[in-house]
């Protein structure tokens, strides 16, 4: 096959066509919600509000800011571990996220906040759009280094669409609880990406094996992403929870789960090395699995010790996955998972879904209180036949729906991305920035250089 990686026309045309289409659609459909509209002044009078502090902005913006940093800085830098793919990891993540949030505002708006004429946008819409793009960033990790930016734009277009449909089915039809997105974001994104990676299997990827590794400095850059994600994950899991106790509880639960996950990941990483040394791959990734696994139950009454247990289990499973499961997937199933998203997002996402089903099924008035139970699960008076067991079954069904949507959608999108005209690199040039980026030339000598002749290099 002849590979043509020149994107001079393909990438500009794809970006400009998509953006022009988005501008037209925003012009027709998107308007401000009341909290962002000049009529808010009148709304305050109608609702007898004396201050602007009741505006949704003041409740949601801190969480939105944290989630936004996670998407663009956290995920971007987490994938810079490849020694010659740092530009692409951060740059392509920036590209797909910027496109994805615009398309997500439209898709999620049509399905969830369309008033018959317009999509009304507020800060919660922006957070949900970031969540949607988070799922795309997860899938990007599975195909990192093996796809072109044009392929990523196409993948984002389809994945955002499928994510929005899946989210609507789970949250609006099945009415599951998934505030931190264990099922809708992580499990869906991971298995969608893994399925695409399976369809795009490269039999000669070993020709680029040398570049599919890290260096001391690239691992440090990736650790920056890990720390941003780890610090802000409580905001991620609580960002769209109900005001008050639910949001407060989600932050506490996530905090505890992440802390426990770090200790178990470090313990397993050392125990699995014959000399007891730590593997930076485990520290960068498995330490975050507790936030993923707690996502579905973040705002539920799992209690702090339950959060610690979830983090404990996710840390063990994720670390074991990096050691044993990733090589098995590549050698036996031909799934080339660059970032190990199966271990960080896939399996912990399933654990989170299972934890959600169990936690919902054992909910009771003694634990929540009568009003608290109704508020936590959104029980209306019309739901006379609601029961914790029924909610648990819906939670389990939601997990299966997410996995099915991911697998079927991944196959379809993978087949589309296999077409040879998207500018993808040949197997021997994967994981290489120079294929798509202008790379500055490295200086031949590290000696001091200056146009000032008074400054001389040190003598040898």
UniProtKB/Swiss-Prot annotation:
SUPFAM superfamilies cross-referenced by the UniProt entry: Ammonium transporter (SSF111352)
Record PTM: N-glycosylated.
Keyword Transport included in the entry's annotation = yes
Where does this protein reside within or beyond the cell?
Apical cell membrane
- GO MF term list: ammonium channel activity; ankyrin binding; carbon dioxide transmembrane transporter activity; identical protein binding
Residue ranges of the TM segments? 10-30, 62-82, 90-110, 126-145, 152-174, 180-200, 220-240, 252-272, 286-303, 307-329, 347-367, 397-417
Name the UniProt key words of this record, in alphabetical order: Ammonia transport, Cell membrane, Glycoprotein, Membrane, Transmembrane, Transmembrane helix, Transport
Q: Name one GO cellular component term.
A: apical plasma membrane
Residues carrying a glycan? 48
The record's section on InterPro entries has:
Ammonium/urea_transptr, NH4_transpt_AmtB-like_dom, RhesusRHD
**One example of a Gene Ontology biological process annotation:** intracellular monoatomic ion homeostasis
Tell me, in a sentence or two, what this protein's role is.
Answer: Ammonium transporter involved in the maintenance of acid-base homeostasis. Transports ammonium and its related derivative methylammonium across the plasma membrane of epithelial cells likely contributing to renal transepithelial ammonia transport and ammonia metabolism. Postulated to primarily mediate an electroneutral bidirectional transport of NH3 ammonia species according to a mechanism that implies interaction of an NH4(+) ion with acidic residues of the pore entry followed by dissociation of NH4(+) into NH3 and H(+).
Which family does the record claim for this protein?
Belongs to the ammonium transporter (TC 2.A.49) family. Rh subfamily.
Q: How does it assemble?
A: Homotrimer.
Q: What is this protein called?
A: Ammonium transporter Rh type C
Q: Which organism is it from?
A: Bos taurus (Bovine)
Could you tell me the gene encoding this protein?
A: RHCG
């Amino acid at each position: 096959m002849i590979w043509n990686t020149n994107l001079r026309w393909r990438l500009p045309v794809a970006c400009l066509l998509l953006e022009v289409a988005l501008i037209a659609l925003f012009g027709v459909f998107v308007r401000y919600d009341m909290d962002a509209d000049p009529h808010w002044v009148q709304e305050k009078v109608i609702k007898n509000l004396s201050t602007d502090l009741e505006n949704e902005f003041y409740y949601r913006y801190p969480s939105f800011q944290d989630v936004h940093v996670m998407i663009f800085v956290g995920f971007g830098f987490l994938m810079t571990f490849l020694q010659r793919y740092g530009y692409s990891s951060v740059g392509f993540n920036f590209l797909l996220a910027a496109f994805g949030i615009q398309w997500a505002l439209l898709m999620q708006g049509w399905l969830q906040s369309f008033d018959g004429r317009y999509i009304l946008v507020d800060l919660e819409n922006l957070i949900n759009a970031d969540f949607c793009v988070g799922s795309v960033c997860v899938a990007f990790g599975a195909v990192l280094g093996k796809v072109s930016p044009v392929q990523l734009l196409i993948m984002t277009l389809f994945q955002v669409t499928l994510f929005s449909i899946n989210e609507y089915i789970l949250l609006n039809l099945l009415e599951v609880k998934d505030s931190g997105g264990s099922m809708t974001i992580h499990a869906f994104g991971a298995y969608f990406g893994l399925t695409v990676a399976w369809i795009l299997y490269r039999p000669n990827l070993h020709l680029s094996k040398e570049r599919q590794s890290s260096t001391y400095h690239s691992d440090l850059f990736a650790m920056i992403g890990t720390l941003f994600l780890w610090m802000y994950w409580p905001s991620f899991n609580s960002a769209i929870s109900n005001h008050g106790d639910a949001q407060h509880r989600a932050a506490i639960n996530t905090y505890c789960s992440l802390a426990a996950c770090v200790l178990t990941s470090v313990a397993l990483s050392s125990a699995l090395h014959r000399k007891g040394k730590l593997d930076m791959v485990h520290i960068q990734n498995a330490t975050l699995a507790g936030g993923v696994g707690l996502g579905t139950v973040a705002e539920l009454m799992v209690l702090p010790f339950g959060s610690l247990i979830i983090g404990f289990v996710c840390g063990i499973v994720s670390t074991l996955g990096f050691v044993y499961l990733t090589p098995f997937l590549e050698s036996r199933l031909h799934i080339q998972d660059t970032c190990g998203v199966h271990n960080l997002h896939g399996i912990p996402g399933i654990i989170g879904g299972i934890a959600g089903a169990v936690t919902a099924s054992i909910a009771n008035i003694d634990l929540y209180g009568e009003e608290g139970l109704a508020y936590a699960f959104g029980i209306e008076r019309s739901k006379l036949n609601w029961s914790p067991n029924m909610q648990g079954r819906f939670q389990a069904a939601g997990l299966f729906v997410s996995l099915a949507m991911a697998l079927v959608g991944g196959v379809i999108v993978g087949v589309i991305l296999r077409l040879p005209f998207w500018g993808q690199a040949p197997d021997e040039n994967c994981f290489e920035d120079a294929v798509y980026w202008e790379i500055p030339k490295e200086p031949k000598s590290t000696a001091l250089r200056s146009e000032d002749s008074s400054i001389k290099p040190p003598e040898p």
